[in-house]
Amino acid sequence: TIAHGCSFTRYGWPCWPKFVPWFNGNIRMINKGRSGSGNETISRAAINSAMKHDMIEHMYIMWSGTDRYEVITKDRIADEREGRATYYVWDDDCQWSTWYGGHPEKDKHEYYRRHFWNEEHQYYRTLEHIHRTQLFLDKKRIPYTMMIFNNYVLRDNYYSESEQELYNNIDWTKFLFYKGRKGLWEFAEDNYKEYYIPGESHPPPIAHYHWVKDIMFQSEVLCKEDEYNK
């Protein structure tokens, strides 16, 4: 079993992939989430996993913000992250480094956002990434479940007929949502806000556990009390 997503999938404490084995017969989970991932990055990583790994029992994908983009370089030197929100990771499979969180130089990031980034385009591309990933996983006959990290990943008003048709070609039965078209962010804020660390926007582990239990598996089974109280 493999998980892909952003920091709502892999962070500095246990996230939802940690708890999936508690409900699926303890099948081994490989968490390939990366903080700052955009949907192009997530799609590429999911497709690469499908090509790289044999006998994938299930793939779980949590889509990220439409505003994010990636920067590719061939740098292999050590990444000095101190004082910077962005970071890069060398990918042996693709033979390049991916910058997560946007361009590392603020002026270039702002220039890109001002002159090249377009909101309508980003929403359209997100649907493309979802659709492409579904087509590939279907071809490989890999079972999969898709989710969103918050309700801004998708929208109800479409900019064009093409965007509407692309939306209609996505298999939405493969998605799990909270309260209509909401994601983990809203689920955690609505139900587990008292557990948040002050100043932290990422859901605490208890919210991730209940996301798996209540949303993903809709299970009545409770974990051991000592685990729950950690």
Go through each PLM region and give its residues.
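Serine-esterase "nucleophile elbow" of acetyl-processing enzymes
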Residues: 1-52, 203, 207-210
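Alpha-helical cap/lid subdomain in secreted, periplasmic
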Residues: 47-230
